[in-house]
């Protein structure tokens, strides 16, 4: 089941997946509590196993902090989260969604119809990223 969650509910998955090699890294992201930001959680047996955050800016949205616990990867949870967000944004007549995708996640997003825009860049200390976008009709 996918539902809206509070920012603090994303922290455990962020820590385990997105910040696992950075024990002192804060799990709160800039903008987590902004009124134009929302968070989704994917629940299995009342446990959050997948998360993502969306920041709205006009009719453009940024997806960030997308993560699925390792033991639940490969079960289409990430795809379902992204598709849910796309449906929500499409119904609100958004024109574009974008993200800074880790280099290793590019094939996942390409399968969902996202395209690379621009050159590879580094977000320290995370690693190599690409801006990826998808336009809504």
Name the predicted role of every residue range.
Residues 68, 74-87:
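Conserved acetyl-CoA-binding loop-helix of GNAT-fold acetyltransferases
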Residues 14-45:
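Active-site rim helix/loop that mediates acceptor-substrate recognition in acyltransferases
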Residues 56-66, 73, 123-129:
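A conserved beta-turn-beta hairpin within the catalytic core of GNAT-like acetyltransferases
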């Amino acid at each position: 089941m996918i539902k809206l969650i509070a920012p603090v509910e994303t922290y455990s998955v962020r820590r385990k997946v997105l910040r696992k090699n950075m024990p002192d890294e804060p799990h709160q992201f800039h903008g987590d509590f902004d009124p134009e930001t929302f968070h989704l959680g994917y629940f299995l047996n009342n446990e959050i196993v997948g998360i993502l955050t969306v920041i709205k800016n006009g009719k453009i949205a940024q997806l960030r902090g997308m993560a699925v616990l390792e033991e639940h990867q490969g079960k289409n949870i990430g795809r379902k989260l992204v598709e849910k967000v796309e449906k929500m944004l499409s119904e609100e007549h958004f024109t574009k969604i974008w993200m800074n995708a880790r280099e290793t996640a590019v094939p996942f997003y390409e399968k969902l119809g996202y395209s690379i825009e621009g050159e590879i860049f580094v977000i320290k200390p995370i690693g190599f990223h690409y801006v990826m976008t998808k336009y809504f009709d």
